[in-house]
C-alpha cells in the first residue's frame, strides 16, 4: 500500500510538472499569437474607386507596411486613422468608407505586418503594437494629414490597437471610436473556450495568453472622447465584453452605443448615426 501511495504521489508530481512546463512553454513561446494572427495569401494589386494614395511605410530594415490614404474630392474636414479588424484587408475595409468620404473625411488605414500586402512576419503582439505606433507617427508627418483633426477608429481587434494608440498619443487626437472590441485577450480567450465546449479549462486561458493589449487598462488613461459601439447579437465578441470595456472607462468622456446586427457591421445598419458620431468628435 505504501509503495502504491508513493508511486501515486510521484505520478501526481510528474503530471503537475508537465502541466506547469506546458503552460510556461505556451506562454513564453507565444503560441497563442500564432492562433490569433492567421496568415493569408495576400493580393497582387490594390484597387479602389476612391481617390487614394498608396504607401509603403518602413518599420524596420527590409520590412514595409502597406497603407492607403483615401481622400475626398474636396478639402478634408478631418482625418480618420483606421485600425483594421484581424481578418480585414484594405480591399474589403474600404467598403465601409464611402459615407465618411462623402462627408469630407480622409481615411488612413494599414495592413499589419505579414498580412495582405505588408511585408515581414507577424511574430507577436508586442511587435505589432510597436508597428502601430511607428505607423501612426509616420502618418502624422504626411502633408495631407498635418493641420487636420485626427480620429482613431478601431474595429474588433483593431479597437484594442486603437485604445493602446490613443493612450500613448492622446495629445494628437480628437477622440476614438471602437466597435466590437473586447476588454482583454484572456477574456475573449475564455469566451472561445466556452464556444468550443472547454468551459472546464477556462481557468488556464489567462495563464497561457499574454495580455499585450489590455484595452480595459489602456482606456482608463484616456481623457479624450470615446465612443464604444457593440452589437447585442455579436457572435464573435460577446456584448458583455463591450460592456466590461465601458465599465473600465472614464464615464464622463465615454459613450456606450448599443446596436444590433452582425460583428462590426454597424456602418451598414446605422450609417447616418455612425457618421454623425465622427462628425461630433470634430465639432461638426
Regions found by a protein language model. Give the residues of each.
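Alpha/beta-hydrolase fold nucleophile elbow
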Residues: 145-156
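Acidic catalytic loop of the alpha/beta-hydrolase fold
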Residues: 233-237, 264-265
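C-terminal catalytic histidine-bearing segment of alpha/beta-hydrolase fold enzymes
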Residues: 243-284
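Short alpha-helix in the alpha/beta-hydrolase fold that links the catalytic acid
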Residues: 215, 224, 238-247
Amino acid at each position: 500500500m505504501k509503495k502504491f501511495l508513493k508511486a501515486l504521489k510521484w505520478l501526481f508530481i510528474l503530471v503537475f510538472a508537465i502541466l506547469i512546463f506546458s503552460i510556461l512553454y505556451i506562454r513564453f513561446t507565444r503560441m497563442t499569437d500564432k492562433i490569433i494572427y492567421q496568415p493569408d495569401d495576400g493580393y497582387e494589386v490594390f484597387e479602389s474607386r476612391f481617390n487614394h494614395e498608396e504607401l509603403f511605410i518602413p518599420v524596420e530594415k527590409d520590412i514595409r507596411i502597406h497603407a492607403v490614404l483615401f481622400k475626398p474630392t474636396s478639402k478634408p474636414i478631418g482625418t480618420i486613422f483606421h485600425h483594421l479588424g484581424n481578418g480585414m484587408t484594405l480591399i474589403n475595409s474600404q467598403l465601409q468608407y464611402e459615407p465618411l468620404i462623402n462627408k469630407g473625411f480622409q481615411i488612413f488605414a494599414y495592413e499589419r505586418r505579414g498580412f495582405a500586402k505588408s511585408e515581414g512576419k507577424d511574430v507577436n503582439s508586442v511587435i505589432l503594437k510597436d508597428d502601430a505606433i511607428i505607423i501612426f507617427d509616420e502618418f502624422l508627418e504626411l502633408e495631407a494629414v498635418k493641420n487636420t483633426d485626427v480620429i482613431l477608429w478601431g474595429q474588433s481587434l483593431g479597437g484594442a490597437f486603437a485604445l493602446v494608440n490613443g493612450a500613448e498619443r492622446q495629445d494628437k487626437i480628437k477622440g476614438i471610436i471602437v466597435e466590437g472590441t473586447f476588454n482583454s485577450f484572456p477574456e475573449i480567450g475564455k469566451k472561445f473556450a466556452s464556444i468550443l465546449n472547454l468551459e472546464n479549462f477556462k481557468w488556464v486561458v489567462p495563464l497561457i495568453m499574454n495580455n499585450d493589449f489590455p484595452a480595459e487598462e489602456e482606456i482608463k488613461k484616456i481623457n479624450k472622447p470615446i465612443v464604444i459601439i457593440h452589437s447585442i447579437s455579436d457572435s464573435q465578441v460577446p456584448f458583455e465584453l463591450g460592456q466590461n470595456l465601458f465599465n473600465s472607462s472614464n464615464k464622463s468622456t465615454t459613450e456606450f452605443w448599443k446596436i444590433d446586427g452582425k460583428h462590426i457591421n454597424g456602418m451598414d445598419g446605422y450609417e447616418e448615426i455612425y457618421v454623425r458620431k465622427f462628425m461630433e468628435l470634430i465639432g461638426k
